[in-house]
Swiss-Prot record:
EC number: 1.-.-.-
Stored SUPFAM superfamilies: FMN-dependent nitroreductase-like
Alphabetically ordered keywords of this record: Flavoprotein, FMN, NAD, NADP, Oxidoreductase
Domain of life: Bacteria
Cofactors demanded by this protein: FMN
Family of the protein in this entry: Belongs to the nitroreductase family. HadB/RutE subfamily.
CDD domains (UniProt xref): RutE-like
InterPro entries, A to Z: Nitroreductase (IPR029479), Nitroreductase-like (IPR000415), Nitroreductase_HadB/RutE (IPR050461), RutE-like (IPR023936)
Name under which the protein is recorded: Putative NADH dehydrogenase/NAD(P)H nitroreductase XCV0587
NCBIfam families (alphabetical): PRK05365.1
GO molecular function terms noted in the UniProt entry: oxidoreductase activity
Amino acid sequence: MSDSLNAAALDQLFRTARTQNAFADTPVSHEVLRELYELVKWGPTAANSGPARFVFVTSAEGKAKLKPALSEGNAAKTLAAPVTVIVAHDEDFHEKLPYLFPHADAKSWFDGPREGRTESAFRNGSLQGAYLILAARALGLDAGPMSGFDNAKVDAAFFAGTPIKSNFLVNLGYGDPAGLFPRSPRLSFDEAARFE
C-alpha cells in the first residue's frame, strides 16, 4: 500500500468535511460526475459485484420527477442542489458476475429467487454509496446524504419494471457554509469500538 495521506487530505475527506444543506448556485458538469463514478467503481465489493446503480438528477425535469417522493424537510434543499444522486442497487446484479468476477462461477452463488440476493445487493450498494461521498469530497465537491424520502415513489418514477431499488439520496455541489448546522459530536473510540 502507498503512504498515508497528508493531514490536509484527511481533513478534506473526514475531519473538516460537513453534511451540506445548501449549495452555491454553481453547476456540476457531467464530466465531473463521470470522473466521480470512475473513482467510485474501484471501491471493493463482495465478489467485485458492484451492485450500485446511480442516477445523477441534474435537470429540471428530473427534479420534478423526484419532488413527490421527498419528505417536507428535504424538498427545498434537494430541489435547489445542483445534483441529487439516487443511490440504488440492482437486485439482479449477479447477471454481470461472469464479466466482473471471472475467477469463479460467482453467478451461481446468487442464482435462485431474487430475495436471496437482496441483502448482498443492499449491503454492497450501500458501501458504494459511501465511496461516492468520499470520492465527491476528494474531487472538491460537497455532499448531503439523506434518507428522508419515499423509496416506493422513487422506484416507480425512476426504476419501474426493473430489478433496481433505491437506497438513499445524496445532494452534491459546492457547499454554502451558511446552510450548515453547528458541528455535532461523534462517539469516542471507547464508546464505539473495542479490541478482542
